[in-house]
Amino acid sequence: MKKTYIILLVSLLALPTLAEENEKKTGITFEKYNFQSADLKEQKEDIDMENGVLGIADDRGFTLQSRDGKFIFKPYLFMQARGQYNYYDDEGLDKAYNQDNVANTGFSMPYAILGFTGTTFGRLDYNLSINAAATGGNVLQQGWIDYKISPAARFRAGKFKTPFFHAYLTTLGETLFPCLPTSLTASVILPYSLNAVTPSIGTGFDLGFQFHGKLKLTPKRENSWMMGYEVGLWNGSGSGVNTATKTLSDDAHIPSLLYAGRLTFMPWGNMPATQGNSHMLSGKHMLFGLSGGINVESESESTNDTRIGVEWSMLYGRWYAATEAYWMHVSFTERQKIDKSYNFWGCYGQLGYFFTKNLQAGFRYDFLDRNGSGKDGFLNMPAAVVNYYVNKCNLKLSAMYQFTGRYGHANQLDRDNDDLGLSTHSATLQLQYSF
């Protein structure tokens, strides 16, 4: 038994020597933190957030990399746990129906992600994220490869975010609010009883192919004007479908896919995909964007949905500000025998500020013309949030409240119908951990 203990002790003492020898032979280094981690504990003006979940160059977790930096492997973990309270209006129903005003209340876990990201051969980036908290096709949160010819010319294929809306394209966990604007996530209301036709303005994750890149427009300047572009094809069936289910459009005679693109301009250099980061409390970044797309024969081959959006966002020291406006046109396919088309719009503005290195507060005002521009009335949704960062433990605590108001409707029935399925009062407490 004593010999066994002695052998184990010698083996443990020899591990550092063996690791050092292995590093010399293979050129692989193992680090507790990523590149420039010492600086990142204090300040950094820009963090690589290309993988959409966790910044590749921040101080969370560890990285395996070759000496020349051409091979990088970073495993990561990301979790969010929420406590939610939702109060719903009676919607004109008599109390005799004994409906529950409090619903969809309790605890939830929207994300429990394990993933791998990195680079191979200095040109090929990759990312795989498995969300154990999801079901069905959403378990594969994203999975893609990205080949870089140059910074201005890159190809990406797999499951990833469609190029529409600053709110969606922000890195997961880097948003000011725990919940996305309702104007992007709520389904619009159509005056037809078609259960399969419930489009929302937001598009989110999807399977497809994208050509994208960023160019310096004034390369001689230190903080150069930059232009970014993203254009591609996607299934248009959403994040819950990982199979090829599309056909050819009977009306347009083209593949029934989502055709989308986005063009951005950044006057102060590259704009990181964050709405406030406790490691980025200095420097300035700004972005102007224009995006659009058409989803051919979407909603179970029932509609053709066209979307257009404009966006502006800024990081300036401890401040963050953003505003977006978007419009969606829904027309029915010929097989539906519905000649009418409908237009919907939404917009929001939000502002955040770091009062200390750990404490951020924010406000958002969100608008949605949910019943279409042909009817009077819209929804307005003010919201407030407080975020507290425990940087030593990679924790983020968030508390959010949102009110859903109704304004300008022609009658009480339209008023009651416009917020069906949406809570009047919503409160969220969220704990977020990343490694």
Regions picked out by a protein language model, each given a short descriptive name:
Residues 4-13:
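Sec-dependent N-terminal signal peptides
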Residues 17-78, 221-225, 435:
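N-terminal periplasmic/intermembrane-space "pro-region" immediately following the signal or transit peptide
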Residues 58-59, 95-99, 189-195, 246, ...:
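Extracytoplasmic loops and strand-loop junctions of Gram-negative outer membrane beta-barrel proteins
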Residues 61-239, 255-271, 277, 347-362, ...:
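Outer membrane beta-barrel
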Residues 258-270, 390, 421-435:
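Outer-membrane beta-barrel "beta-signal"
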Residues 262-371, 380, 388:
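Detector for outer-membrane/organellar transmembrane beta-barrel domains
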Residues 390-396, 402-417:
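C-terminal beta-signal and adjacent terminal beta-strands/loops
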